[in-house]
């Protein structure tokens, strides 16, 4: 692709952060966050593979099964869903049924209508598992509108972060009978910021509740996993200057959602109508390509090489060929600093999860090592995933662990190579020939072998 200008900006000195949504190919929707013309985050959703998990439906009970302590419900999809009795809020029980010792056959009857949320996707011949205890994920909080006893702080938040969040949450205002969970993205957020998120969730719940009461029969009320809505919820913040969308239907969806939850920033949602394709206009197609390639080049000539193994992801940092008279320590340190930025970016683009080990170029001076550690920390600050670090060890390795946010990019679009089974190597000609001769020998020794036929490549 074309060389990126070193300042990463467009010709007009454009440094605005933007969210770009490309949906011109009906089979795939792509989301990119760009800073000027530098791609900083990327996500894709393939038609027919959307998740239903988190979706909310109006459902009708079709069969009550006392032996399973559950009922089956029609929720508007092909197969009926499975709703265990313990997942049914007592607000849905028939009049006069004691909530304490109730049996499902007394509390629920065929034809009852309920509001349900998908907990587990359907798999194979099993229907989806449902619950009536809805949870709505916001950016910093999860609201449980009909579950008074579900609240707290995400288990992954520890120490003083936990205390601070609890204090902030005690200041929030919301109706009785609801509860809240703080998400990890809420760490370090003030009570007003949390309240802003909560107000959006309360509005959303009102809208869902209203739609459920208004409509008849079984139907989808709220689609959790529409890429657009998730993107605005999880990525949008004040420093994103505009959201550009290149198809009408997705634009309408985003506009409607924004007007509903953040009317003051709704004008930032814009319909992109230029002749040049949206992603080409911001020169990010070739940057997306780097998210699929093993080697990623750095600005001053070095590169990083990313390999997946069973146990971990390894990232090797290589410097450019050293020219005479250059200071080796300085080259090493500069390459490592560039690598730190690129590694943080690739973690996000590829959504690398689990254990990641980086082999930096060896540096003698400890202040340079600290500087590289700090640079990586800063670069990962804007990551939505939770990341933990070690420092650079005496062998020049740095370990980090990163939470997985979604199925990895490569899982969605790549398969293991059927020839090498993912090792990247197959036997060379000589080795193959010898192995085949051994097999021929072994087969021909057997009593009942009349002839041995071997299919081999020409060279072998």
Predicted features by range, described:
Residues 1-51, 58, 62-63, 78, ...:
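Intrinsically disordered, low-complexity mixed-charge segments
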Residues 12-55, 141, 164-166, 170, ...:
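Extended, charged alpha/beta regions that create polyanion-binding interfaces
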Residues 42-44, 48-68, 98-122, 161-168, ...:
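Phosphate-interacting basic helix/loop segments used at nucleotide- and nucleic-acid interfaces
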Residues 53, 154-161, 186-200, 217-224, ...:
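Catalytic cores of large soluble enzymes that bind and process phosphate-bearing ligands
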Residues 67-71, 75, 79-80, 121-145, ...:
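Conserved glycine-centered short motifs in functionally critical loops
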Residues 101-193, 197-210, 217-218, 222, ...:
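Accessory, often N-terminal, substrate/partner-engagement and coupling regions
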Residues 111-113, 216-217, 268, 312, ...:
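Loop/turn-to-beta-strand initiation segments
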Residues 150-154, 177-183, 209-220, 240-246, ...:
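Interdomain boundary/hinge elements
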């Amino acid at each position: 692709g074309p060389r990126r200008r070193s300042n990463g900006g467009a010709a007009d000195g454009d440094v605005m952060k933007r969210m770009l949504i490309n949906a011109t190919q009906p089979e795939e929707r792509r989301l990119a966050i760009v800073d000027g013309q530098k791609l900083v985050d990327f996500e894709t959703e393939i038609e027919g593979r959307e998740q239903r998990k988190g979706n909310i439906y109006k459902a009708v009970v079709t069969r009550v099964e006392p032996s399973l302590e559950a009922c089956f419900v029609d929720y508007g999809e092909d197969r009926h869903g499975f709703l265990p009795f313990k997942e049914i809020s007592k607000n849905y029980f028939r009049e006069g049924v004691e909530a304490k010792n109730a049996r499902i056959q007394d509390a629920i009857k065929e034809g009852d209508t309920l509001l349900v949320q998908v907990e587990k996707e359907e798999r194979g011949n099993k229907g989806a598992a449902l619950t009536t205890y809805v949870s709505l994920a916001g950016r910093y909080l999860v609201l449980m509108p009909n579950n008074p006893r579900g609240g707290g702080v995400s288990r992954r938040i520890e120490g003083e972060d936990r205390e601070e969040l609890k204090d902030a949450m005690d200041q929030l205002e919301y109706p009785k009978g609801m509860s809240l969970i703080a998400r990890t993205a809420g760490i370090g957020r003030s009570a007003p910021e949390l309240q802003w998120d909560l107000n959006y969730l309360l509005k959303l719940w009102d809208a869902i509740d209203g739609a459920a009461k208004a409509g008849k029969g079984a139907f989808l009320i709220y689609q959790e996993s529409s890429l657009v809505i998730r993107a605005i919820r999880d990525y949008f913040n004040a420093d994103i200057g505009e959201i550009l969308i290149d198809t009408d239907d997705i634009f309408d969806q985003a506009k409607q959602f924004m007007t509903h939850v953040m009317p003051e920033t709704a004008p930032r949602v814009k319909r992109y109508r230029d002749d040049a394709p949206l992603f080409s206009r911001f020169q990010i197609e070739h940057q997306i390509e780097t998210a699929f390639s093993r080697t990623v080049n750095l600005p001053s000539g070095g590169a990083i090489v990313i390999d997946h193994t069973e146990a971990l992801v390894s990232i090797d940092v290589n410097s450019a060929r050293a020219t005479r008279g250059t200071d080796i320590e300085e080259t090493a340190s500069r390459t490592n600093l560039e690598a730190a930025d690129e590694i943080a970016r690739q973690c996000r683009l590829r959504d690398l999860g689990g254990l990641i080990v980086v082999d930096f170029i060896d540096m003698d001076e400890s202040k340079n090592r600290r500087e590289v550690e700090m640079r990586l920390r800063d670069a990962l600050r804007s990551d939505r995933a939770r990341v933990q670090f070690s420092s650079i060890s005496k062998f020049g390795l740095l370990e980090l662990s990163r939470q997985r946010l979604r199925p990895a990019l490569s899982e969605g679009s790549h398969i293991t190579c059927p020839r090498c089974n993912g090792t990247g190597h197959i036997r060379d000609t000589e080795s193959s020939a010898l192995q085949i001769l051994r097999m021929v020998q072994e087969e021909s020794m057997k009593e009942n072998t009349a002839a041995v036929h071997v299919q081999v490549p020409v060279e072998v």
